[in-house]
C-alpha cells in the first residue's frame, strides 16, 4: 500500500467511525428512556456480512459493546443475511443470546448497497420497564424479571410487526415509553444504513471487504 492509499484508507476509516457515532447519537436523541438519553446506556456498531464487528461508536458502555458484538452471530444463525430484505429489523432481549439481562434490547438491521446486503448495523439500549416484578434486583429467576423476547422481526420489509408490539405493550407498565425505545433502536440502525450508503457512493466502494 503506497502512501496515498494509506491516506485514503485512513479517511475512509475516520468516516466509518463517524457513521457509527451518528448512529449512536440518533439513538440518544430519539430514545424515550433517561437511561439512554442521560446515562448513555447503549451501544452501536457496524458488522461485516459474517457478523464480525468493523467499528463501534465512541458513545456507549463497554459491557454493551462486547455483548452486542457476540449477539449478532446469533441473529445470523436464525436469520441468515441472504434471507434478510431491505427494510428488515430484528429484535431480542434474550439474556443468553444478547446482552445479559432482559432490560437490554438488541436490534440488527441489514445494510444494502446497490441491491446487495453489504453488512449489518446493530444497536443496544437499556429499556427501563420490561414487566415482571418491577424495578430493582428482587427477582430470583429470569422469569420474574419480565418479558423475554426471542429473536423476532420488529420490522419486515418496512412493515412494523404490530403483533409483537401488542404483546410488548400488554406486558409492561409504560407501553408508550417502551414502544418508543424500540422504535429508536430501529431508527438509529436506519440512520447508520443511510450514512453508510452515502459513504460507499462517495468513496466508490462496492463492499466493505477492503476497508474491513
What are these regions (language model features)?
Residues 33, 42-92, 200-212:
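Gly/Pro-rich turn-and-neighbor structural signature
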Residues 15-39, 76-80, 91-98:
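Short, basic/aromatic recognition patches
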Residues 38-41, 103-105:
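Short, small/polar residue-rich loop motifs at catalytic or cofactor-binding pockets
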Residues 2-11, 148-212:
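N-terminal leader/propeptide and maturation segments of large enzyme subunits in energy/redox metabolism
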Residues 1-31, 50-54, 58-60, 64, ...:
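Extended, highly charged
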Residues 104-114, 122:
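A short, hydrophobic, proline-anchored segment that marks a local hinge/packing element in signaling
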Amino acid at each position: 500500500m503506497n502512501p496515498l492509499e494509506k491516506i485514503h484508507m485512513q479517511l475512509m476509516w475516520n468516516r466509518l467511525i463517524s457513521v457509527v457515532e451518528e448512529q449512536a447519537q440518533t439513538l440518544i436523541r430519539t430514545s424515550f428512556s433517561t437511561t439512554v438519553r442521560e446515562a448513555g446506556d447503549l451501544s452501536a456498531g457496524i458488522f461485516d456480512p459474517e457478523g464480525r464487528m468493523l467499528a463501534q461508536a465512541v458513545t456507549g458502555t463497554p459491557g454493551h459493546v462486547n455483548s452486542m458484538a457476540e449477539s449478532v452471530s446469533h441473529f445470523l444463525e436464525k436469520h441468515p443475511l441472504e434471507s434478510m430484505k431491505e427494510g428488515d429489523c430484528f429484535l431480542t432481549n434474550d439474556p443468553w443470546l444478547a446482552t445479559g439481562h432482559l432490560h437490554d434490547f438488541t436490534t440488527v438491521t441489514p445494510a444494502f448497497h446497490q441491491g446487495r446486503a453489504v453488512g449489518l448495523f446493530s444497536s443496544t439500549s437499556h429499556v427501563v420497564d420490561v414487566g415482571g416484578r418491577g424495578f430493582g434486583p428482587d427477582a430470583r429467576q429470569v422469569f420474574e424479571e419480565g418479558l423475554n423476547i426471542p429473536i423476532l422481526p420488529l420490522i419486515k420489509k418496512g412493515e412494523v410487526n404490530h403483533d409483537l408490539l401488542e404483546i410488548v405493550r400488554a406486558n409492561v407498565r409504560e407501553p408508550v415509553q417502551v414502544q418508543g425505545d424500540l422504535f429508536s433502536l430501529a431508527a438509529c440502525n436506519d440512520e447508520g444504513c443511510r450514512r453508510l450508503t452515502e459513504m460507499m457512493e462517495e468513496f466508490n466502494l462496492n463492499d466493505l471487504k477492503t476497508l474491513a
